[in-house]
Amino acid sequence: EDAQNIIRELDEALMLEGPRLDEAQIDALKSYHMSPFRTPRLAGKVYPSGPDALEKALDNYCEQFPVQRAISRGVVDRVVGLLSPHIDFRRGHRVYAETWQSIEEAFPQFEQVFLLGTDHSGSAGRVTLTQQNYATPWGVLPNDPDLVNTLIEGLGKKFALGEELHHVNEHSLELAAVWLHYFLRRAKGRTSYKNMPTVIPILCGSMTPYIYGQKKPSQDDNFATLLTTLDDAMKKRRTLIVVAGDLAHVGPAFGDPRTWDETARTALRNADYAS
């Protein structure tokens, strides 16, 4: 009887596979699709929920940490990518501010943005699309349904959308999207600015099989399809690729038993270079 009660409670808590969990997932996906945009989950928690307060916060970050190495005018036309953090703004605001400001001169040119971020719940080797629009307190960042549909057709619906619910709570894309939207809004005043670019959100699961040499991305049909399709799209429109990917999470704040001192930092840095 005790075992039966435990099983029932786990089932009611949606912690067991079965009809109840399947139905809950279907309902959650319907709710996500019916919304006009993906609801920002971290507004009011990691960053201000009001547009004016958010703008003031990011203004302050950028004023406090002006860019150290902005791209030269001769390089503006060749900017294609940016590696952004996705840690909380309290700890990462300096890196966010300096990184995004470094390519500010290029923002008026972009017609589409591929926003790739870590899926902290994603399956190994999985990329997960969504047809939903992302949004920030400033409004909607429009997706490109035609391009997303082309990707879904090439990758297969099960692979491309099987973990779409991860978009609901995943923070990596949301935090980068806030900075993206901030700089796109700043670009509006430039003479070369045209329209708000489309923003295609893509979550990326664990790369463990590739890191440990179990297989190569070039031998993966799904990755080949993804890259070929995105490459074709880039030939038609001026594109920015944003990768929202943190590096090492180290120190007591992330569960390490000791403080991450300069000796340990140097060892990690050397290991990174060696790899």
Range-by-range predicted roles:
Residues 1-42:
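Long, charge-rich, low-complexity alpha-helical segments
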Residues 36-275:
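Active-site histidine-anchored catalytic micro-motif
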